[in-house]
Curated annotation (Swiss-Prot):
It comes from the Eukaryota. The modification N-acetylserine is found at S2. Residues 146-211, 301-357 are annotated as: Disordered. Component of the U3 small nucleolar ribonucleoprotein. Required for the early cleavages at sites A0, A1 and A2 of the pre-ribosomal RNA. Participates in ribosome biogenesis. One of its GO terms (cellular component) is nucleolus. It comes from Saccharomyces cerevisiae (strain ATCC 204508 / S288c) (Baker's yeast). One of its GO terms (biological process) is endonucleolytic cleavage in ITS1 to separate SSU-rRNA from 5.8S rRNA and LSU-rRNA from tricistronic rRNA transcript (SSU-rRNA, 5.8S rRNA, LSU-rRNA). The keyword Nucleus applies. Present with 1430 molecules/cell in log phase SD medium. Keywords: Acetylation, Nucleus, Ribonucleoprotein, Ribosome biogenesis, rRNA processing. InterPro entries: Sas10/Utp3/C1D. This is U3 small nucleolar ribonucleoprotein protein LCP5. Its main location: nucleus.
């Protein structure tokens, strides 16, 4: 209640001050008919001529001030309507709608514009303050310089008169400086012509020729030696090994192994099984190709969809109780993957037919 009373007192004080200023203006305007007062004439011209001119543009500051004053006026009318139940003024009845309208203008119109223009306004104000400061500093330096010149002028006047006769017979130093400058510039031009003879020829013909750049190999990393050899992970027939052999080689090798995060290799929320290492490598190659070439590979054709569905069906068959038993589903024999004979071509037709089974 104390805050509300203080707020009402402030509102009453502002209203009394506004009423006093309006009474003063009305007194000045009423006396303008009898007495010729320049202030009253200016007020009369502003009210009847300047204020009635159509405004071509509305500034942000005027819109903000007008909306704020209209919002405060609507709130006061709404408060008065609440306090006085017998009030029949139609403007007081529409105070709620006008207060909502002004509030929307302030929040949706003025505030976003202020945020957009805040950087430019701050930049302009900083530039103005900086310019004003530099102007004041320049004035201060000029004043100090003028005072120093005035003090030193009286002391040096006698020395200047005595040295005028000596300076009258001095050599022409400006000519020496100009010749030195010309000679140095000439030497620089000659050296440039000798070094860049081809460029001078190009300038004379008017045709641009790019400079010749010697081919240089890219920098090679000598501090780290990558011992990974992709040929060790393939058979001589260029076909993939059995899954059991792949896992055995991967676990027994000393090479650093790359693995996805936990759960990243689960396909189709667990219904598609677990993504194999071959599929992961393929996706990684596709991703690196897309990132290097800035393009998308369209691999969602019918054949790929058919293969994907087949892989999902096989994965559902191989996963039992959450464990992948796909290492036992390969039709190839272990002897064919480990022995040298398996990499060679079979000798008889019966062996080749048996190999296809």
């Amino acid at each position: 209640m104390s805050e509300l009373n203080a707020l009402l007192k402030d509102i009453n004080g502002s209203l009394t001050a506004t009423s006093e200023s309006l009474e003063r203006l009305s007194g000045i305007y009423s006396n303008s008919a009898t007495d010729e007062i320049p202030e009253s004439n200016q007020l009369h011209e502003h009210l009847f001529y300047d204020a009635k001119k159509p405004a071509e543009k509305v500034s942000l500051l005027s819109l903000k001030n007008g909306s704020m004053l209209g919002y405060i006026n609507s709130l006061l009318m709404l408060i008065g309507n609440r306090l006085d139940d017998e009030c029949k003024d139609p403007s007081a009845m529409d105070a709620r709608e006008r207060s909502i309208q002004h509030r929307v203008v302030l929040e949706r119109g003025v505030k976003p514009l202020e945020k957009k223009l805040a950087y430019q306004l701050d930049k302009l104000t900083r530039a103005y303050v900086k310019m004003e400061k530099e102007y004041k500093d320049a004035e201060k330096r000029a004043l100090e310089k003028s005072t120093l010149v005035n003090h030193s002028g009286n002391d040096d006047s006698e020395d200047d008169e005595s040295s005028e006769d000596e300076i009258a017979y001095r050599p022409n130093t400006s000519g020496i400086i100009n010749t030195n400058k010309k000679s140095s510039a000439y030497r620089v031009e000659e050296t440039a012509k000798q070094e860049n003879g081809e460029e001078n020829d190009d300038n004379e013909t008017g045709v641009y020729k790019p400079p010749k750049i010697t081919a240089v190999l890219p920098p090679q990393q000598t501090h780290f030696e990558d011992r990974f050899d992709a040929r060790e992970h393939k058979d001589r027939s260029n076909k993939s090994r059995m899954q059991a052999m792949e896992e055995y080689i991967r676990e027994s090798s000393d090479q650093p192994d790359w693995s996805a995060s936990i759960g990243a290799d689960i396909v189709n929320h667990g219904r598609g099984g677990i993504k194999s290492l071959r599929d992961t490598e393929k996706e990684r190659r596709v991703t690196s190709f897309e990132e290097d070439n800035f393009t998308r590979l369209n691999i969602t054709n019918k054949a790929e969809k058919r293969k994907q569905k087949q892989r999902e069906r096989n994965a559902r068959m191989n996963v039992i109780g959450g464990e992948d038993f796909g290492i036992f589903s390969s039709k190839r024999k272990l002897e064919d993957s480990t022995s040298r004979r398996g990499a060679k071509k079979t000798r008889s037709a019966w062996d080749r037919a048996q190999r296809r089974l």
